[in-house]
């Protein structure tokens, strides 16, 4: 998305005294193994943000200093301002690690014991969504108590006070709402960039939410947006809601535009096979989905090769993250995306298209191009 867009997003969403950016994967892991591009370190550098590094200290003592030294010296400006030691086994273990780190001049701002418990549950794509967490407030209260016991907030606040002020951004202008966009949102589909939904609103979308699990049919709309999620977990309930599946398929056949990503793509195939059970889905595309144990996780780089709902031909960046594969694809299938980096649906090809529908494994950030504008423009009014 570029530096300017990144700064704009951060400033727009920073409405607190302290804003926390969660890193993903390893600190220096990014687009490839050659540079820091698109890594957590790269983001921190662009935002001029200090970094608190969390290190797994289990099964180590003095060697933790070698790990910390490697992270701080790997790049000439690591931006690392403090360390949290995770999975500490005992007071003696903590003392050994502290002694090892004494000469690095990096503040230790927290020590978390290994038996502190996994309070927030996870599944194959990460933390279980808020909508599926039981007794969430009780769990958050426990997390809050643990944080108070384990972290030195005075040191954290001191680090945060050294942050450079970022530029102010102009309020965004919103076009008059003229196109209704129905967004699937429930326990089966809830992986959305909030900025994508805001981008649609900015371009003139009137947003309606619906549940593919509970509602009988889609609301009256010009466009349907089905994001990622866990359709395999809710496969039985999705398959049993025949009126919803029928309404989506008929809408597509009648010209309603549909944009679907990952879980949405799976929902539009004929079936999803999960734990040796096959669940019948919408069948808009003549292919099937099968869950696997193999993780697909990539930044993607590719090209949209044909005019479609979201774009004219152009290059794009995105990401893919799933444990599924699309099978029984007809040999004459034409794909919308050619990928230079990434797996896609099949052999670096991604993007099914039928009627005014686009469905792929790629998760797009709409403001990286005019995707939201094109969706509104190419949807009926």
Cite the ranges covered by each PLM segment.
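ATP-dependent carboxylate-amine ligase catalytic core
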Residues: 1-47, 51, 55-81, 91-95
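Structural motif
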Residues: 20-22, 52-54, 56-57, 84, 86-89, 184-187, 225-227, 361-364, ...
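Cysteine-nucleophile active-site neighborhood
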Residues: 207, 230-308
């Amino acid at each position: 998305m570029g530096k300017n867009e990144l700064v704009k997003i951060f400033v727009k969403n920073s409405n607190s005294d302290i804003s926390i950016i969660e890193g993903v994967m390893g600190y220096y892991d990014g687009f490839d193994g050659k540079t820091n591009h698109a890594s957590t370190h790269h983001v921190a550098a662009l935002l001029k943000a200090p970094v608190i590094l969390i290190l797994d200290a289990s099964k180590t003592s003095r060697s933790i200093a070698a790990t910390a030294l490697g992270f701080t010296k790997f790049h000439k400006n690591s931006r690392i301002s403090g360390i949290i030691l995770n999975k500490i086994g005992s007071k003696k273990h903590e003392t050994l690690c502290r002694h090892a780190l004494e000469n690095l001049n990096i503040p230790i701002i927290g020590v978390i014991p290994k038996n502190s418990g996994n309070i927030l549950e996870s599944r194959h794509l990460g933390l279980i969504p808020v909508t599926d967490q039981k007794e969430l407030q009780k769990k958050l209260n426990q997390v809050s108590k643990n944080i108070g016991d384990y972290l030195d907030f005075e040191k954290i606040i001191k680090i945060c006070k050294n942050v450079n002020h970022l530029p102010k951004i102009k309020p965004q202008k919103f076009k008059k709402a003229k196109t209704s966009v129905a967004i699937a949102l429930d326990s089966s589909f809830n992986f959305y960039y909030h900025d994508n939904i805001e981008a649609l609103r900015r371009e003139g979308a009137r947003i309606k939410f619906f549940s593919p699990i509970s509602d009988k049919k889609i609301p009256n709309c010009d466009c349907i947006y089905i994001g990622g999620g866990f359709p395999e977990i809710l496969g039985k309930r999705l398959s049993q809601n025949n009126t919803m599946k029928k309404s989506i398929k008929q809408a597509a056949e009648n010209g309603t535009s549909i944009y679907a990503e990952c879980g949405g793509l799976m929902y539009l195939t004929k079936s999803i096979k999960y734990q040796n059970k096959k669940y019948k889905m919408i069948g808009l595309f003549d292919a099937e989905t099968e869950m696997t144990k193999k993780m697909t996780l990539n930044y993607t780089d590719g090209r949209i090769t044909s005019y479609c709902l979201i774009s004219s031909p152009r290059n794009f960046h995105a990401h893919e993250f799933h444990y599924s594969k699309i099978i029984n694809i007809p040999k004459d299938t034409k794909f919308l995306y050619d990928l230079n980096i990434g797996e896609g649906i099949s052999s670096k090809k991604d993007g099914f298209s039928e009627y005014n529908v686009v469905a792929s494994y790629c998760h797009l950030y709409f403001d990286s191009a005019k995707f939201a504008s094109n969706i509104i423009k190419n949807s009926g009014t």
